[in-house]
Amino acid sequence: MKLTSDVVKKISSIKGEPKWMLDFRLKSLEAFNKSSNPNFGPKLDIDYDSINYYKEREEKLTDNWNNISCGVRNLFDDLGVISAEKNYLDGIGAQYDSEVIYHNMNKELKEKNIIFLDTDTALREHPELFKKYFNTLVKYNENKFTALNGAVWSGGTFIYIPPNTHLDRPLQSYFRINSKNMGQFERTIIIVDEDSELHYMEGCTAPT
């Protein structure tokens, strides 16, 4: 799939994003087209036109594993995600290709005003907080890869921990790529306020 402004606009339209986010995506696309592959790390020969940049969700976002199709649910079960949530975690998000399909946290955390959401929901429900911290630590124009992520990002996790708040157990996000030539471009945004503490984990897999 050739990465064009039409692809970027389609992603933003499907997600129902505000204009400032579409503008950010298009600005990132321009930076991507103008930059070369970074010279750090190994030499990478990437065919950008062979990447599938976005796949529309087949599963609706839910906080109940029983609402997810058996095949996908069994996959996450085999990966240990479901049992980890039951036994070790205060909350978990699970992404399948381009979109988060499962997200949940213990009700005790909600009572502490902790925010733990997928990025689309966070942008919709907490727009000012999201915009304040989005693109502040890693800038879209740092290199070609950050620009690419800025243009086509989808999914990921948004966490806000209020002041003087400590979590007893970790939060986790799990990212699964399951489609051929699929690119996964999630964003992780974590804000831990003054005198607070969080243990956060990520996991990711793809077919061998």
Residue spans of the language-model regions?
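Glycine-rich and polybasic anion-binding loops at the starts of cofactor/ligand-binding domains
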Residues: 1-208
